[in-house]
UniProtKB/Swiss-Prot annotation:
Name listed for the protein in its UniProt record: GPI-anchored wall transfer protein 1
Record flagged with keyword Lipoprotein: no
Keyword Acyltransferase in annotation: yes
Glycosylation sites: N21, N346, N499
Entry similarity comment: Belongs to the PIGW family.
Length: 504
């Protein structure tokens, strides 16, 4: 039902008020909701590892894949939003039941004669320096799905207001979501840096800037398209989120050139985490010791900078989050251990590799948690409050700590149920094990993540222009969200099925 033009202006104000002046929820509750994703990954992995449920990939397999990796996450922010622990318990019960069911025995491949085996092994491509690990696909795919769900769900009354973006001070699920989007982009961005190091090359600053601008341009164009669309259609806006003209695509678009500049600083401080902390601390000091905080929160909007001050200055916090993500990527993407050719050492090599990665990830998780504690605790720390609006130091540390713990949880599922992936000796075997250990739905979201996110924004706008979301009941809300995510997932899986990659 279209909204009558005579009430459009007052309805627009209602929608703006609906997402304004919110104070968020507790960090512990947000952690419980976020925990649904790795628990879902556990259920999926037990089904696959014990029962080979998704091999071959049938329509039933797709339905269960969708229900787990999309449906459960949708439930966590709607019908089960007040009981995330119960949802986690129910999912863990399913995982335990499936695990206890006798394992499905797969038919073994016929043994090849010795001469055929030697020919086969000689033609196999050896492993490279980097690896596409299943837990990274699961982590990033789940993050993209939750983000897509929330950007539409927030406009309905069924979505709890404590999960929507906070006005100034506090924490919320959507505040974590936007930070996680940037953090995960940083993880992925470490891949070309690692390739350069492996090849012993170091691209000059001018080359890095040219490459970064090529990545930035499409995002900046999308930012301008969104700006013109919002203004032209008189769409409801939340000005204190980014400013009058700024939007998230501009933040994403300006990240690559600044990251390229910061890469030069590695000669002085050879750590992305160190650079992230340095930037975050300097920015926080400026907020606390100058009039910058007051300017961002209460200054008049009388020129282009002041109109977009939230977007401009929060960019430095998001840059710090991106660098923290890049540091994590430098840890989890490479193959840090050399592999032995002999079969007797394969298991040892894989075991040592898993243990080493586990200890490093756990260590960094503790570091980020400790830093967040000292930044925010009133008794033992600095007593600072989280602000996504300014993307201050506590916000950056909260995002880094939460994502580090989430990655660790996804990795534990990976290492426990698909350990053979870490013992693969050639590209073909590793690819087969990777496909076995990852959901087709999550792989599809990963492949065209930014394009699907853009499509989700378009669908969100379409729904808001045609449906009075504030007047929709619980059942209808769930129906709309399921249809919306069903369409998005169908597009993502369809693109993947036809081997289409959209680079933005």
């Amino acid at each position: 039902m279209a909204i009558d033009s005579t009430t459009a202006q007052s309805y627009k104000q209602l929608k703006e008020d609906f997402v304004s002046n919110l104070s968020g929820g507790s960090v512990s509750e947000i952690a419980q909701v976020c925990a649904v994703a790795p628990v879902v990954s556990l259920v999926w992995s037990v089904l696959q590892a014990r029962q080979s449920f998704f091999r071959p990939y049938t329509p039933l397999g797709y339905a269960i894949d969708f229900l787990l990796n999309v449906g459960a996450l949708l439930l966590s922010v709607t019908l089960y939003s007040s009981a995330p622990l119960l949802l986690n318990l129910l999912l863990l019960t399913v995982a335990a039941f499936v695990y206890l069911v006798p394992a499905h025995t797969r038919k073994k491949k016929p043994q090849l004669p010795p001469n055929a085996q030697s020919k086969k092994s000689s033609s196999e491509q050896p492993l490279g320096v980097l690896s596409t690990k299943p837990f990274l696909t699961n982590y990033r795919g789940n993050m993209l799905i939750v983000t897509c769900i929330c950007i539409l769900a927030v406009d309905f009354r069924l979505f709890p207001r404590r999960f929507a973006k906070v006005e100034t001070w506090g924490t919320s699920l959507m505040d974590m979501g936007v930070g996680s989007f940037v953090f995960s982009a940083g993880v992925v961005a470490s891949r070309p840096v690692l390739k350069e190091r492996a090849e012993g090359k170091a691209a000059p600053l001018s080359t890095r800037l040219k490459t970064s601008l090529r990545h930035s341009l499409p995002l900046l164009v999308l930012g301008f398209i969104r700006l013109l669309s919002v203004k032209g259609l008189d769409y409801a806006e939340h000005v204190t989120e980014y400013g009058v003209h700024w939007n998230f695509f501009f933040t994403l678009g300006f990240l690559p050139p600044f990251v390229a500049l910061f890469q030069s600083a590695l000669k002085v401080l050879p750590s992305y985490a160190g650079l992230a902390l340095l930037l975050g601390v300097v920015y926080q000091v400026l907020l606390e010791t100058t009039s910058l905080k007051a300017y961002i929160l209460t200054g008049p909007r009388n020129d282009l900078l002041s109109m977009n001050r939230e977007g401009v200055f929060s960019f430095f916090g998001y840059l710090a989050i991106f660098l923290a993500g890049q540091d994590t990527g430098m840890l989890v993407l490479p193959r840090s251990l050399s592999r032995s050719i002999s079969g007797s050492n394969n298991k040892t090599s894989g075991t040592v590799q898993r243990r080493s990665l586990l200890l490093n990830m756990a260590g960094w998780s503790l570091v980020w948690i400790a830093l967040y504690f000292f930044a925010t605790d009133y008794k033992y720390g600095f007593g600072l409050s989280v602000s996504r609006r300014m993307a201050n130091l506590p916000y950056m540390l909260w995002v880094a700590a939460s994502n580090a713990v989430l990655l660790l949880a996804f990795y534990l599922v990976d290492a426990l149920l698909f350990p053979s992936f870490y013992s693969a000796q050639d590209v073909k075997t590793e690819k087969e094990l990777y496909d076995m250990a990852t959901s087709k739905v999550l792989r599809a979201y990963n492949r065209n993540g930014l394009a699907i996110f853009l499509l989700a924004n378009l669908f969100t706008g379409l729904v808001n222009m045609t449906v009075p979301t504030l007047d929709v009941g619980r059942v209808a809300t769930v129906g709309i969200l399921v249809a919306y995510m069903g369409a998005l997932t169908a597009v993502a899986v369809g693109l993947d099925e036809y081997n289409v990659t959209i680079k933005l």
